[in-house]
Amino acid sequence: MARNKIALIGSGMIGGTLAHLAGLKELGDVVLFDIAEGTPQGKGLDIAESSPVDGFDAKFTGANDYAAIEGADVVIVTAGVPRKPGMSRDDLLGINLKVMEQVGAGIKKYAPEAFVICITNPLDAMVWALQKFSGLPAHKVVGMAGVLDSARFRYFLSEEFNVSVEDVTAFVLGGHGDSMVPLARYSTVAGIPLPDLVKMGWTSQDKLDKIIQRTRDGGAEIVGLLKTGSAFYAPAASAIQMAESYLKDKKRVLPVAAQLSGQYGVKDMYVGVPTVIGANGVERIIEIDLDKDEKAQFDKSVASVAGLCEACIGIAPSLK
């Protein structure tokens, strides 16, 4: 059986980490694409030279032409400008929208059957634009947000409770930005909901509120520490988990930015929701009950994403 083909559009810090993880997990052969000559070729060769040490078989190809992604099973898009200190994800809008237009055209021409995962920020608006520019069906184009945001929430909770991250489940809905909605009621430690753990005296509501805010600020915290770039290890690991669920038809329940068609009262927009990811892409969108406060937060998050999409249309009217 032929190996799967994974195309990575953008060979920066996330792109290189994606390639390494795809190799380590033997998900398939990898094509690294970038407009910077030498960068994808150099990273590809470097990772390939690690394969005898780590014991994995995969071919790594660096390219500066979209033709190299032809027939890819999965395309992961990281191309664009990363955040710098003081920048919000939204500041990147104008620059990265132009990048999505070029990437969408490349995918449409060379990999129209692929499952596409977008990581470029501002995430919810960029994946929405990418789906329109590429013309791919919405269930085959998703944004990586919720897996990362939930992972941050889970890690902070595991630290607070001094338990294994494996025993913590966490739920984050909404846009990938300051308005994201971490849901304490649906988050658990070994099946015990967080509100119950507060009642049991494991933590206080004040501490939990601070963890929720730290989750919202998770990306900015790393940008502030690194000073010259943004997070790349956890975002890459999150996208690989999504790609693996698709390639292996695992049907994982993963929070991703998916196009909604009436669920949660939202239409024709990409927002972070729990989904089932399998061989057909987004196979199910899970619509959970939200209480009044959660719904208000979610609606605020949706309004924020809608504003970004409107701004995109202002820059590129063809998106309307």
From Swiss-Prot:
Residues that hold substrate according to the record: R83, R89, N121, R152
E.C. number(s) listed in UniProt: 1.1.1.37
Active site, UniProt feature: H176
Pfam families: Ldh_1_C, Ldh_1_N
Reaction equations catalysed: (S)-malate + NAD(+) = oxaloacetate + NADH + H(+)
Residues that coordinate or bind NAD(+): G10, S11, G12, M13, I14, G15, D34, N96, I119, T120, N121
GO biological process terms, semicolon-separated: lactate metabolic process; tricarboxylic acid cycle
GO terms for MF: L-lactate dehydrogenase activity; L-malate dehydrogenase (NAD+) activity
InterPro entries on file: L-lactate/malate_DH, Lactate/malate_DH_C, Lactate/malate_DH_N, Lactate_DH/Glyco_Ohase_4_C, Malate_DH_type3, NAD(P)-bd_dom_sf
Keywords of this entry: NAD, Oxidoreductase, Tricarboxylic acid cycle
Family: Belongs to the LDH/MDH superfamily. MDH type 3 family.
The protein's role, per its UniProt record: Catalyzes the reversible oxidation of malate to oxaloacetate.
HAMAP family xrefs: Malate_dehydrog_3
Protein name: Malate dehydrogenase
Organism: Brucella ovis (strain ATCC 25840 / 63/290 / NCTC 10512)
Organism lineage: Bacteria, Pseudomonadati, Pseudomonadota, Alphaproteobacteria, Hyphomicrobiales
Designated gene of the protein: mdh
